[in-house]
C-alpha cells in the first residue's frame, strides 16, 4: 500500500536516506532494500522498538500514512517537518503535524492517497526492478501450470463460502491447471473445510512472505479475498481476481501506480449495507465500505452474494 509513496519519495530525493517502520512480519520483504529504503520493525506495544527509533538521528521529513496519532511519534523523533492527511478525527491526532494534505474529493486508491504525502500526483507506474523478490527458504513448488486460491483474510466478514471455493477449484482444474490452496499461519482449518478429501495441494499456514511471493510469482493466476495476498501479488506481478464484500475495490485496488497490473475485482456494486464513509476515522463522501464487526454482522451477505460464475468469468479473462 505504501509503495507509490516510497517511489515518489525516491524520485524527489534521490540521495536521501529513507527509513520506514514496518511490522516485524513484513520486515523480510524489505531485505532487498526497495527504493533504497531502510526498514525497521516497529510495534507500538513494544517499548524496545520505540527505543530503537529514538536512538536515530532526527529526520528532516516525516510522513504519516494512516492514523495521524503516529504524528506524535514523528514529533518525538525530532522530525523537522511532519506531513499527514487532513480531516482526521479526533482533531488532537493532527496537532503535531506541520502540514496536512487534503484528502482527494474524487475516488482514489488508498495507495495513491498515501503517495500524496510525498508530493503531487504524477504518472509514474511500478517498475519491477525497483523491488526485487527477497531470498526465500527452499520449498517444493508445483511442477505444472498452476493457480493459487488464497482463501483467508483479516476478518471473517470477508470470507467466502467453502463450497464456492471448491467449485472454483474444480472448474480451474478441469482446464488442465494445477490448483493449490493457501492461507496464512493458523488458518489451515479453512482449507480443510473447503477440501476435506485433500484433492488439491495445500500450502496453508506453511509459507512465510518471501516464499508466498515466490509461489505467486510463478502462478498463472491468483484468486483471493481483499487481503494482504492481493497486495503482494502486485509486487509479484501475478494476474489476480480479488473478491470484495465489505471492502472497496476503489480504495484497495490497483489505482494509478499499479494500473499495469492484470487484475479483476469481483463485487456486488452498491450493496445496501456497504454504506460507511470512514477511512482512518476521516469521512470521505465518495467512500463506500463496511467496517462492521462480526458482532454487528453475524453473516456477510455481501460476500455470500458473490457467485461462482462471476469469479470464473474473471478468471477466464485473465487466463486467455
What are these regions (language model features)?
Residues 1-320:
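Catalytic machinery of carbohydrate-active enzymes
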Amino acid at each position: 500500500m505504501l509503495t507509490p509513496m516510497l517511489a515518489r519519495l525516491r524520485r524527489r530525493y534521490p540521495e536521501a536516506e529513507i527509513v520506514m517502520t514496518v511490522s516485524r512480519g513484513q520486515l523480510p520483504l524489505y531485505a532487498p532494500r526497495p527504493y533504497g529504503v531502510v526498514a525497521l520493525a516497529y510495534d507500538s506495544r513494544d517499548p524496545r522498538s520505540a527505543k530503537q527509533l529514538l536512538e536515530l538521528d532526527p529526520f528532516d521529513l516525516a510522513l504519516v500514512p494512516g492514523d495521524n496519532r503516529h504524528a506524535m511519534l514523528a514529533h518525538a523523533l525530532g522530525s523537522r517537518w511532519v506531513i499527514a492527511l487532513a480531516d482526521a478525527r479526533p482533531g488532537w491526532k493532527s496537532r503535531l503535524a506541520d502540514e496536512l494534505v487534503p484528502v482527494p474529493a474524487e475516488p482514489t486508491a488508498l495507495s495513491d492517497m498515501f503517495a500524496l504525502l510525498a508530493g503531487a500526483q504524477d504518472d509514474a507506474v511500478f517498475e519491477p526492478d525497483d523491488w526485487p523478490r527477497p531470498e526465500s527458504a527452499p520449498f517444493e513448488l508445483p511442477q505444472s501450470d498452476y493457480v493459487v486460491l488464497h482463501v483467508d483474510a483479516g476478518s471473517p466478514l470477508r470470507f467466502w463460502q467453502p463450497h464456492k471455493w471448491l467449485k472454483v477449484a474444480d472448474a480451474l482444474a478441469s482446464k488442465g491447471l494445477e490448483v493449490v490452496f493457501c492461507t496464512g499461519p493458523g488458518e489451515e482449518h479453512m482449507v480443510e473445510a473447503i477440501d476435506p478429501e485433500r484433492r488439491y495441494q495445500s500450502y496453508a499456514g506453511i509459507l512465510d512472505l518471501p516464499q508466498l511471493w515466490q509461489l505467486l510469482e510463478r502462478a498463472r493466476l491468483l484468486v483471493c479475498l481483499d487481503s494482504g495476498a492481493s497486495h503482494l501479488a502486485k509486487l509479484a506481478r501475478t494476474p489476480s481476481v480479488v473478491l470484495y464484500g465489505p471492502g472497496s475495490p476503489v480504495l484497495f485496488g490497483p489505482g494509478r501506480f499499479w494500473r499495469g497490473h492484470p487484475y479483476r475485482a469481483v463485487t456486488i456494486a452498491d450493496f445496501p449495507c456497504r454504506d460507511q464513509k470512514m477511512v482512518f476515522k476521516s469521512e470521505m463522501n465518495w467512500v463506500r465500505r463496511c467496517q462492521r464487526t462480526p458482532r454487528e454482522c453475524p453473516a456477510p451477505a455481501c460476500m455470500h452474494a458473490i457467485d461462482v460464475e462471476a469469479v470464473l468469468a474473471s478468471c477466464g479473462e485473465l487466463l486467455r
